[in-house]
Amino acid sequence: MKILKKISKVIVIVMAVLATIWCGLYVYANYFYNDKQIDVENFYIAELPLTPSQFEEDFKEIHQIVMENYSLYQAKHLNMDSLYQACDARVRQAQTTTDYGLIVQEYISALQCAHAITCYKRYTANQRVAFIEDFLFVDKPNDYLTEYGFQDKDRIIAINGLPYKQWIEQNEKYTEASTVPHRRLRTAYDAFRSYADTLRNYTLLRGGDTLTVTLPLKQRDYFPDNEEQTVESRILQDSIGYLTIKTMMNPVMEDFKAVYPKVKDLPYLIIDVRRNGGGNSMNGVNICKYFIREAQPHCVSKSYIMQPEADAYKGKIYLLTDTYTLSAAESFTLD
């Protein structure tokens, strides 16, 4: 009888533990994966659902949220009261949602944090420029740019009549970034994107000729979604593998696993995470497991111990990084 009672107690305890685990998983799933919890509606600043009389109160709420959640301003020696007062004075004078939206964009960018973003939609040509040795170039133009007369390797020397360096300097105030080089680079990449402009003039240098092209910038849904590979591989000189990891956003893990077998047995491997703006931290961690030799703590969370994969790379690794390597991509390089 005593044995039966003990068994009964054990069963009850096990059932209670299982019930607790189930409840925990249920709460976790509902809190973190319920779309209603994370649903966000994005707007073009010209279409913000606000009237001028609402600007000041809306901006006050934004500032309060920042103060409650952004403790890093102290380490960056930011005078938040001064920043708020300077922006608030301009908010009171704003007449349109475009005026107001650009002030908010400046405020967020002044936080000097690449993770602090407004999520405003931008008009675009769906094209990134090449920024090489502080020069702007058209790089493999898409059909839309080609239609308006752009050609590969055109050098952009002015935007809207401003020399391109001056244009970058004037627009850096709208760019979210943690460092000065990163801010400049990201601003250069915005040559074909804008929060407010729907039309831009570009002065191009092509060979020995100078020409001007007027280009409408479109809403993002004008362009079809192209599924670009997040990881690319190639082999140099028969013995050097080259992996370009463009992002840590999904589906990077699936793309990585598809190309990794092509390079895993080569004696040398170059991993290029330049221009990788980050994404999901766990993707960076899981990819890193293929390039470590022994268990080690994750650089961000020391309590998380990374274990090397069974088929982890055993050759010599060269890692390429730059001032645009950010967030999950940066922690990947540190690991």
Feature locations, PLM:
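Flexible, low-complexity junctional segments that flank or bridge functional domains
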Residues: 2-268, 275-277
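Bilobed periplasmic-binding protein/Venus flytrap-like ligand-binding cleft at the lobe interface
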Residues: 62, 332-333
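Short, solvent-exposed amphipathic alpha-helical segments in soluble enzyme
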Residues: 258-261, 288, 333-335
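Hydrophobic "anchor" residues on beta-strands that sit immediately upstream
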Residues: 268-270, 318
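Short hydrophobic alpha-helical runs that function as membrane-insertion/retention elements
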Residues: 270-271, 299
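Gly/Ser/Thr-rich loop/hinge elements
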Residues: 277-327, 331
